[in-house]
Structures are given as structure tokens and as C-alpha cells.
């Protein structure tokens, strides 16, 4: 039978139909589709999406470590280092002056503006008293100013410096000041002093003397006491004897202020020692050289230490410097030989007493007054 005969064609079609029916029976099978099995658990579940489920990481696998949280470090506050503050020459607080002044190179008594003074920026009561030749306490009392002696710019003060007598070297002194005070101390500046015609004499600090409760700045090497010579045109410059007459009771006798060796003698030349220095031990007694009244007891100035000044009469004063302990107070009456202090080394480099005698404000050699020993 040829391939193109009708019988062959029918047979072929029938065979193909049987194959199609068989295939259709396979697709209509009642067996459910194979389940999708989870990799990790093995349990079955149906899915309609046909998407693969990504399994979680297996136990024992090293997970990616999360970044560790670093502790927050707070900045450590370093202690502030205190820097030295340069003292400003002038500070103003509520219109008032707060001013710390060094008097080392400021001439005293140089004001010649009359009996009043107008406060300027930078002034203090101490400074005004200094340049007008007054004691700051008297000046405060005269102008009703109480401690701490605050001033206002433009304030007018009564300084009592009506005469305004100039002194060679830029210093000045008035008779009003001379009548009020009579304390004399040391200096290393040379000048000519005009002496007021009053029984009590006061000299400017720049010329080797000072008003009550004031001392000169330290212009001398440590351990050396220096006082510039003073020329007083209105009084005799010849050194008097201890028995010289005076307008007040004469001093009958002088006595040594302490025991010990004289280690520095009086020097009359310019820049020389205007007293004597006596060596001793700390705590050694120092006594008044004669009867008198204490007009100064303090330590307001570097280089002189604890200083006591005694006024014996209108002409004579004695000074005791570098004391360790002062046993008297200002305005106290003392007797010759009375213990007034103990020896020390305040304001100097070694234990000693610097002792001076002044006659009408002029330094004289204490050895000419003290008894021989």
C-alpha cells in the first residue's frame, strides 16, 4: 500500500488521536503536584508564586558582625593655669579709683598748686599726701575721708599747701606740714631742704626725711643704710655737741640702744651711711636711747623693715631699723633704756640694728653722742 493512499492516511490520523488522548489523560491525573520543600526544615507547603524562598543562614555560620558602638569620649577639661596679671596702673569701679602705686621714684612735696588739689585719674589719697608733703591720715581727716580712702575724679581736697615753697631736686615742703609733723628718716637722694621756721621740722622724703607714718623707698643695697646729706640753709650746718642748747628740754644723757659690735660706721660723704649698724642676735633687746615719744612704728617700706622713730625734743630724733618685733606704738611715751623692740633682719640680709640720730633733720654721727665703751 502506497503512502499516498486514503487507507494509510486514515490509519495515521487514528494513531495520532490515540496518542493525544493518552497525553490528555496524563494531564488530568488526580495526583497533586510535588510540594516545594524548605531546605532547612523539610516541611512542605504550597506556593502559588513559584518563587524560590531564600533559606536563612545555617547554624554555625559566622554572621556578619555589626560594628561595635564606641564609647563617647568627652573632652577632658584641663585645669586653667593662672597667668600672672600685669597690674594696670588705673582701674575704675563705679567712678571710683582703685590704684596700687609704687612710690620708689615719685618725689614727695613737689606739688605747688596752692592749698587745694583736684583729684585726677590715677590719684590716691596716699599719692596726694606724698606730693603735697602731708601725712595721709591728716589729709583724710582734714577732708572727712574714711578708709579705704576712695576718691572721685574731679574731687577737690584741702591740702594746706598754700606756700608751695619749691625745693631743689623737684621736692617741696610747707610750713603747714612742718607745724603738724616732725618725723625724719632716710633717703638716697641729694637735695637742698628749705627748713620751715617752726619749732618742729619736717623734711621731704626725697631729701632724706619724711612726714609722720611715711618711709622712704629702698634705694640702697641690702644690708646697707644710706641717707643723702641734707643742707639746711636756715640752720647751722655745724654738727652740735650733745650738750647743745635747744628750744626744748635738753637731753641729759644718751645710751646705747643695744649691745654688739659696730659693723658699719657713720659716713658723712654723699651716699654714706647716715647712722651706725650694730650686729647682734635675733631677739636681742633694743632700748630707747633717751626719753621721748614714738612718732612712727611700722614697716611700710621695703629695705628698712620694722622701723621705730622716737622724737626726743624739738631738735633730736632717733631711728631704729630692721627690728624683729616692735614693742611700742605711735604716740607712746618712752623712757631712756626702755625696751622698744627686738633685733632682727627685716628689710636686710643679716641680723642687725641700724641706728640714727638726727639734729634738726640732719644726720649726725651717733658715736659723738653715745658714751664710750
Swiss-Prot record:
Main localization category: membrane
Keywords per UniProt: Cell cycle, Cell division, Cell inner membrane, Cell membrane, Lipoprotein, Membrane, Palmitate, Repeat, Signal
Annotated GO biological process: cell division
Taxonomy, superkingdom: Bacteria
CDD domains: LysM, M23_peptidase
Lipidated residues (N-palmitoyl cysteine): 26
SMART domains with a match to the protein in the record: LysM
Positions of S-diacylglycerol cysteine lipidation: 26
Region (4 X 7 AA approximate repeats): 199-246
Presence of the UniProt keyword Cell membrane in the record: yes
Location of this chain's protein in the cell: Cell inner membrane
Family: Belongs to the E.coli NlpD/Haemophilus LppB family.
PANTHER family linked: MUREIN HYDROLASE ACTIVATOR NLPD (PTHR21666:SF263), PEPTIDASE-RELATED (PTHR21666)
Free-text function comment from the UniProt entry: Activator of the cell wall hydrolase AmiC. Required for septal murein cleavage and daughter cell separation during cell division.
Identification of the protein by name: Murein hydrolase activator NlpD
Gene that encodes the chain: nlpD
